[in-house]
Amino acid sequence: MSFDLLIQGGTVIDGTGAPRIKADVGIKGDRMTAIGELSAGDAATVIDAAGCVVAPGFIDVHNHMDGWLLKQSHVPSKTLQGFTTEVIGLDGISYAPVNEQTAREWIFYLKALDGLQLSDYEGWESLGEFMQCLEGRNVQNAATHVPYANVRSLACGFGRGSVDDYQMRQIKDVVRQGMEQGAVGLSTGLDYIVQCFADTDELVEVCNVVAEFGGLYATHMRYKSGTMRALREAVEIGRRSGVKVHISHFKGVDAAAVAVNQIEDLLPRPIDARPRSCAGPARCVSVFIRHHRTSQRAWR
């Protein structure tokens, strides 16, 4: 047998739940074509994996790599840990969808997190256009959510207040466009800028669109209102809209049993709700200050 790449002598864990095995892996093109005892095979490249685990690439379902995937062709801090796919657009904040004005605002807001400069902006507006900009830029794969703060800022700006009917139509159109362009779901960060002004009814209406596509609602809940109260809201959004719910970095590991009981008690019918826990103290806060010179002087 002939391969482009032969990985020999490793311990294969295939991700299916099957027991680990000692095996070789043969690859041709971008496909694994054989797993087993392949010592008789030849290949252009041979990797000695003795003492190592050979596994499918890991998917990082919560990160803020949005800008780094655009700026760097290779991020060793992720690939050396085995991450081959990044799911971006989390916590309701990213670099798309935008218009010319909100693009500037989001680049400024996310500067410390993702490091993009205005000079890095290539004119994208829709989520699909931004993902197209990522194509071929980085060795990793990428999937994205529709980030709700970006969507809401397009319709309502960055101020307080609830949405009116016209703004809601705009929001739903942009979310629908994002889902049609391949987004896996909608993300929110309800402690953060813009989306903190969205009430439960607003989020249910938007998630109705996401549910049409079988998408996911990934939420950094409204933790500042109290973990259990925030949990009740997340479950209600899933129940009323029919959307699948993913709770980002659940803050309350010591109350996990209470949280599970809370979810079960709240469900008159089953919904797909899954928490992902935050095992340590939160380490990120955000302060949004208008970057007009007079505001900066007042702050200093």
At which residue positions do the language-model features occur?
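Histidine-rich, glycine-flanked metal-binding segment
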Residues: 1-57
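Divalent metal-coordination and catalytic microenvironments
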Residues: 10, 30, 51, 62, ...
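Di-metal (Zn2+ and/or Mg2+/Mn2+) metal-binding site signature of metallo-dependent hydrolases
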Residues: 53-77
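Active-site environment of divalent metal-dependent phosphoester hydrolases
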Residues: 66-68, 93-97, 152, 191-195, ...
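Divalent-metal coordination cores built from histidine and acidic residues
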Residues: 71-184
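Active-site neighborhoods of metal-dependent hydrolases
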Residues: 130-134, 138-165, 171-192, 207, ...
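Divalent metal-binding pocket/active-site signature
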Residues: 177-233
